[in-house]
Amino acid sequence: MKKLLWLDDFRNPSDYVVGDYDISLVKSYAEFCKFITDNGLPDIVCFDHDLGEEKSGYDCAKFLVNYCQEHNLDIPEFDIQSTNSVGKENIRSLMNNWHRVYSTRLLLDKN
């Protein structure tokens, strides 16, 4: 069963997620960071951008990318359920950029 980390201060994952997943719900930047630090990467991360606090889903995505850089890991699968279109695109761009960097490193290391 895939492990899914749901980041959202408002939405309940059971209202949105279809399928058989082991879901962990976190509602803040601090909870997100603690989950990743304690458990490593899940198989899938679902991001909200606006968390109703100082830190946003984008900050969580930056933490995740830094974690991946430090541990030489690719990003997990991800989705973004935020209604904030600018925040959504910022998260998507950050995550996709790290995936491209990681994939390029793998290719260079093989040569």
Which residues are covered by each model-predicted region?
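Catalytic phosphate/metal-binding cores of nucleic-acid and nucleotide-processing enzymes, i.e., regions
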Residues: 1-111
